[in-house]
């Protein structure tokens, strides 16, 4: 699938990585709570997604709901507009999901939440690189901490 442990959409209870599948935050929905957790404004979220789109194929997709694949949902959710644009632009479902994974990491990495979480993990004795990897791979602090402890215990 291009992103083995891809989360559910935020509106379906997914973790913070699910922000990669969100529409622009123009109406009240669970995205606002997720952005509050990240300590990120809706404007900053939009900027990050639009800039990512400018330098990747996710910027394509003029016939999608919001004019760009950066705003499209997970590949497992049927969408004729997204699928048409993927085919038109020769983007495989795996490539699409890999790009969405990179987008999720970019959103989280650019948040105050990420910086603060990494600092806390480091204070708890977890190396910075492991802390970053675990937070980005899980989108959830509890799961990230558990994963980090397992990684450290292996060594």
Curated annotation (Swiss-Prot):
InterPro entries the record matches: Methan_mark_9
Superkingdom to which the source organism belongs: Archaea
Name under which the protein is recorded: Uncharacterized protein MJ0115
């Amino acid at each position: 699938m291009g992103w083995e442990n891809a989360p559910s959409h935020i509106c379906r209870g997914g973790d913070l990585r699910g922000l990669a599948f969100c529409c622009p935050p123009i109406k009240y929905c669970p995205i606002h709570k997720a952005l509050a957790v990240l300590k990120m404004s809706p404007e900053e979220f939009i900027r990050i997604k639009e800039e990512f789109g400018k330098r990747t194929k996710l910027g394509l997709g003029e016939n999608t709901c919001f004019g760009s694949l950066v705003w499209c949902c997970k590949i497992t959710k049927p969408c004729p507009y997204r699928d048409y644009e993927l085919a038109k632009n020769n983007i495989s479902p795996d490539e699409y999901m890999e790009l969405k994974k990179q987008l999720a990491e970019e959103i989280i990495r650019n948040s105050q939440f990420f910086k603060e979480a990494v600092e806390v993990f480091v204070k708890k004795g977890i190396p910075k690189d492991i802390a970053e990897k675990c937070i980005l791979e899980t989108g959830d602090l509890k799961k990230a901490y558990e994963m980090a402890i397992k990684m450290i215990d292996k060594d």
